[in-house]
Amino acid sequence: MRTIRLLAAAALIFLPAASFGTERFDGNWLTKLTCPPKGNTEGYTWQFPSIIQNSIFHGERGAAGQPGYLSIDGPIAGDGSAKLTANGIVASREYARGVFAHQGESYSYDIKAQFQETTGTGTKGQGLGIVGRTCTFEFTKQSPASPPNAK
């Protein structure tokens, strides 16, 4: 019986710390995606808001279902490592590489990312339709909004 009480006490002490550690990335983030020009394909940089909640990343750019849309999702491990998945719709052949890269076509790729407390970086894997250039990601945690002055 004494062993059970000790285990219960230890669980109460250590569980809050464990959950805090896995949610340390939670908050609003700014995501910057940069794909350099290569060959006849133009480069581009997109910035869009993202959120991490319960150590799950979610970011969206554009209108769902429309050319230029991009959604990024995935879990973040306690050490900050993440394998995120991007799904999008080609905006213009001018900015996309590959045989199937035509306006309105869907694409997807994986992102290998590493998060710190307030910053993160990532690189795009080779995805169908947009192969052949390295795209990079920068993640910056945003400060929480200041509460309004109470009067």
List the predicted regions and their residue ranges.
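Short, linear, compositionally biased motifs with a strong N-terminal bias
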Residues: 10-13
